[in-house]
Amino acid sequence: MVATNLSYDHKPDSERERKRIEGGGGYVAPSRMPGVGFVGPARVWDRTRMFGLATSRSMGDTVYVGPNRSGVIAEPEVTSHRLDANDRYVIFGTDGVWDHVTSQEAVEIARRHPNPQKASEAIAQCARERWRRNGPMQDDITAVVVGLA
């Protein structure tokens, strides 16, 4: 069973999103700490440089949305995929999952757990374990497996 990605991460450092952000009046850079330099992931900054947002699309961060602000938009990416007899699952996950679990790994985990609830829990647990190995920080982790059979 092979994973098929139905979306891409809306992160400021992807070339596609960075160009769109810069065209919308924002710019992309990590946070800067005095005496330390740049830290953390790339962020979207508006002209005031008061806040940096680590995602390039958002429906709730309205301070970033609007003309000549930051280039952050609330417009979703919509894709389609024609199902065939080999498709078994749709797996949704937050960036806390996808930062540490590949799409193919998620498919393999789901295949080992026929119950969608158990598969969802196993994918989330895998992500949590990998976050813990990388230090004390952990992002939000949510996984949902929908069975198509």
Question: What annotation goes with each model-predicted range?
Answer:
Residues 1-149:
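PP2C/PPM-type serine/threonine phosphatase catalytic core
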